[in-house]
Amino acid sequence: MRFQFKRRLSPRKRRHLRVRAKVFGTPERPRLNVFRSNKHIYAQIIDDTRGHTLVAASTLEKEVRERFPDPHPKIEEARIVGQVVGERALAKGITRVVFDRGGYKYHGRVKALADGARAAGLQF
């Protein structure tokens, strides 16, 4: 009776676990991870062999917020975050990444972030 109620993962978490089983970042080609909340979007470039975050950007940063046009829809915010993470990655010598959509559909803000990173010069 102790384990009568099985804890269930959300569908996004299950998809993310499936994706993470296949996507792995190396030093030559690290992983570009996306996390999307209702209000903000976050992007990290991660080297999974060492477990270190090499580059990060989010809509919470003042430097990123200053680039937002007025008014700024969330898709435009995501595109700018993608550009910033791409610029920071190129400054550190990272040109190729593996895109980890984090269990989200490749649509809307996630797609806009990926397009912004590609526009900045990242290849994936």
Swiss-Prot record:
> What keyword terms does UniProt attach to this protein?
Ribonucleoprotein, Ribosomal protein, RNA-binding, rRNA-binding
Identify the InterPro entries for this entry: Ribosomal_uL18_bac-type, Ribosomal_uL18_bac/euk
Name of a matching Pfam family: Ribosomal_L18p
- SUPFAM superfamilies on file: Translational machinery components (SSF53137)
> What GO molecular function annotation could you give as one example from this UniProt entry?
5S rRNA binding
Assigned GO CC terms: cytosolic large ribosomal subunit
Could you name the domain of life of the organism this protein comes from? Bacteria
Question: Which GO biological process annotations does it have?
Answer: translation
Q: Which cysteines are joined by disulfide bonds?
A: none
Q: How does it assemble?
A: Part of the 50S ribosomal subunit; part of the 5S rRNA/L5/L18/L25 subcomplex. Contacts the 5S and 23S rRNAs.
Write out the similarity annotation.
Belongs to the universal ribosomal protein uL18 family.
Task: Give the protein's biological function.
Answer: This is one of the proteins that bind and probably mediate the attachment of the 5S RNA into the large ribosomal subunit, where it forms part of the central protuberance.
Write down what this protein is called. Large ribosomal subunit protein uL18
Native source organism of the sequence: Thermomicrobium roseum (strain ATCC 27502 / DSM 5159 / P-2)
